[in-house]
Design a protein with these regions (language model features):
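Non-catalytic terminal regions of proteins
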Residues: 42-235
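Short helix/loop segments within enzyme catalytic domains
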Residues: 1-38
Length: 235
């Protein structure tokens, strides 16, 4: 559950790009580049199929994102599942027994499992909780059109920059600030468009370092040693 929560928060923070990164990383590392409709029963992480399904469900509910954009990403996630899923009508939760063999502990209809993901996303991201002042996580942090515009702008620049250049990290058209989430989302979008992974990764990391230097919290404390307090004394 904790890992599912982390995935949902990642999707709220950097938008559908988080779902793309989940999928490409997992599919690329799998032996046959397939998505399995099965998972080890004690695995704390949702399997690749469930992570893509969560990405789709969160994206569908991002009210601050244009509906056409949401629909396009939802269709993209559906196509990923259709292309890479080993065809199955069931989702299997298994354990390993002596000798390394797999024992199917629970077999759930795949449609029911995907419906469970829909309910899970609703409860984690969009249900108001007393523990956070009767707000939902999506009310506290959510990806919007403004974020998407910034991410696309930075992604476009990442695709055309040279090694010694950096993208424009100034404010967006509505004066919204660029945050690390925008750079992370932009890097994913850029790699999907043109898989020059080392170059785009380096540009993104250097952009994040630049944001780090500009951030008043992370750029360093005004008081480092006890003697520094004299510099800031009002007396």
């Amino acid at each position: 559950m904790n890992e599912a929560l982390a995935d949902v928060c990642g999707l709220l923070n950097i938008g559908p790009s988080a779902g793309i990164s989940f999928a490409t990383l997992a599919i690329g590392r799998s032996k046959n580049r397939n998505i399995e409709a099965s998972s080890y029963i004690d695995d704390p992480h949702p399997n690749t199929l469930l992570r893509i399904a969560m990405a789709k469900e969160v994206t569908k509910r991002l009210d601050g994102l244009d509906i056409k954009v949401r629909e396009a990403y939802s269709e993209f996630f559906d196509k990923l599942i259709e292309k890479y899923l080993n065809k199955s009508d069931s989702f299997i939760l298994y354990s390993t027994v002596e000798g390394g063999a797999k024992n199917s502990d629970y077999i759930v209809p795949l449609e029911s499992m995907l419906k469970t993901v829909e309910i899970l996303v609703e409860k984690i991201a969009f249900t108001r909780l007393r523990s956070i002042g009767n707000h939902s996580l999506s009310e506290i942090n959510s990806w919007t059109n403004r974020d998407q515009v910034l991410a696309h702008r930075i992604a476009t620049e990442l695709l055309h920059l040279q090694e010694n250049e950096l993208p424009d990290l100034s404010t967006g058209p509505d004066k919204q600030e660029v945050y690390s989430a925008h750079v992370a989302a932009a890097a994913v979008l850029a790699v999907v468009k043109k898989p020059e992974i080392p170059l785009i990764t380096d540009l993104a990391i250097r952009s994040l370092c630049e944001l780090y230097k500009l951030d008043p919290v992370w750029s360093g404390l005004p008081v480092w040693y006890r003697s520094d307090t004299e510099k800031h004394s009002p007396m």
